[in-house]
UniProtKB/Swiss-Prot annotation:
One of the primary rRNA binding proteins, it binds directly to 16S rRNA where it nucleates assembly of the body of the 30S subunit. InterPro entries: Ribosomal_uS4 (IPR022801), Ribosomal_uS4_bac-type (IPR005709), Ribosomal_uS4_CS (IPR018079), Ribosomal_uS4_N (IPR001912), S4_RNA-bd (IPR002942), S4_RNA-bd_sf (IPR036986). Keywords: Ribonucleoprotein, Ribosomal protein, RNA-binding, rRNA-binding. Gene3D superfamilies: Ribosomal Protein S4 Delta 41, Chain A, domain 1 (1.10.1050.10), RNA-binding S4 domain (3.10.290.10). It comes from Clostridium perfringens (strain 13 / Type A). The keyword rRNA-binding applies. Part of the 30S ribosomal subunit. Contacts protein S5. The interaction surface between S4 and S5 is involved in control of translational fidelity. GO terms for molecular function: rRNA binding; structural constituent of ribosome. Belongs to the universal ribosomal protein uS4 family. This is Small ribosomal subunit protein uS4B.
Amino acid sequence: MAKMMGPRFKMCRRLGLNVVGHPKAMKRAGRGTSRADKKLSDYGIQLLEKQRLRAYYGVMERQFTRYVDQAFNSKEQPGEALLMILESRLDNMVYRMGFASSIRQARQMVNHGHFLVNGKKVNIPSFRLNIGDEVVLREKSRKTEMFVNNFKDSIGSEVPYVSKEEDNFKGIFTRKPKREEIPITIQEQLIVEFYSK
């Protein structure tokens, strides 16, 4: 499976965005000039924003382009539709539900088959959740202390479009998120403009 490679904290500095999920990522990235600090052309600004969003969700270029095509073909605003597609990926929702400390860790957990979606084992990080879908940590995976601690420590800090059942190690994708509820600082309209040319 293709992966986004490269020093993670260096990538944070280069893109001017915490794309690894670590709470101290930007501090550990150190000082230096990011692309976001440099004077860029309109095209350069749009390209940077696309790279920031792609890196945040850990999506490869080809798959990201497919998501963009789907967003443009939807009945919604392309930028918000794109964010909704990315946000509904299983690896991201595992992260939002508090099972993992980063999207990267969530992707590994999904790959290793630690979750059931509506009672069925799913090990595809790009699997898209629908509203009302339930994600449960498998019984045998609850023996891993890190997974249990991640979930319990995140109780009360989940996003508004997710609910959790602590005793059942369950997260539910309850509703479509509003744009302002998605916790990422990105100007999706710049990405729409990039692909509109």
